[in-house]
UniProtKB/Swiss-Prot annotation:
Family statement drawn from the similarity comment of this UniProt entry: Belongs to the nucleoside phosphorylase PpnP family.
Protein name in UniProt: Pyrimidine/purine nucleoside phosphorylase
Organism: Acinetobacter baylyi (strain ATCC 33305 / BD413 / ADP1)
E.C. number(s) listed in UniProt: 2.4.2.1, 2.4.2.2
GO cellular component, one term: cytosol
Taxonomic lineage from the root: Bacteria, Pseudomonadati, Pseudomonadota, Gammaproteobacteria, Moraxellales
GO-annotated molecular function: guanosine phosphorylase activity; purine-nucleoside phosphorylase activity; thymidine phosphorylase activity; uridine phosphorylase activity
Amino acid sequence: MSSAQFDHVTVIKKSNVYFGGLCISHTVQFEDGTKKTLGVILPTEQPLTFETHVPERMEIISGECRVKIADSTESELFRAGQSFYVPGNSLFKIETDEVLDYVCHLEG
C-alpha cells in the first residue's frame, strides 16, 4: 500500500469534471515531472467509459468498483488497497455502487 500523502507537489486548482460530475479529479504534479490525478467517482447507474492516452495504474483508495479493460467481456472487482492497469491508447469501463476514491498514476 502506498503512503497516505504526497509531499513536495504542485496541485492544479481547476478540477477535471467528467460525466456531469460523476467523476471529479485534480492533477498533482511531482518535482520529477510525473503526474497523478486524485479523484472521486460517485455511484453510477451504468458504466463510465474512459479512454487512455498513456498507460495508467488506477489505485483504489476507498470503496469498490467493477472494471472492464479494453475489449474484455468480463468485469473484475477491485477494492480499497488494490490497483488495476490500463494500457495506453486503450479504454476501460468502471462502475460503482458507492463513493470511490482513487489515485490514477499516469505512467507514460
